[in-house]
Amino acid sequence: NIDTLGASLDPDALGAHLVSGNILTFEVVPRRIYDRGGGLARVNGRVRLLEGLAQPREEDELNLRYYNSQTTWIQIDPLLQLFGLTRADLSASDTKVAEAVRRMGRRMPTYVTIKDAKRRWGHGQEDVYPVAQFEKLWSDMTALADVSCGFLVVPRLRGQQLKDLNQLDPWANDGSKEYTARLCGLAR
């Protein structure tokens, strides 16, 4: 995710993923009150990521303790096998890959959200149009019984998402800004 700051190739996280034997390992961070988008939940006895769109009431996500950072560690060959593909298929047949993706997509829910699309024109003028957006969410892979998934709680520094300007001050003051600057080689 472009708005997840602090994600990096961490040898400890990679090692934990490899030792787990899971196809997918999702990093989660402790949730803060302003985090939106879903988190770790138990649904019908299975631990999974439950996005805000999938929850019956908007306020339900406030009860989740861990937030989805959108960072996922993946075992490529088992994931391809789940899709009915091999590495060779990726460069050999666009049609086969597209069919495999569509087949997997049919197993997952589709969410419809209403968003505002803005068309700016003139000096300070804009038109706002409501549009329907159809979404499939990567985190819904955690709901599929044949996909072995794990979850790794990581420091907030590794998985904090900035979706709103109001989140900049807490990000700058909790050490996340310095952590990200070090990752990017910008630390003073």
List each model region and its residues:
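Catalytic core of tubulin tyrosine ligase-like
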Residues: 6-10, 15-188
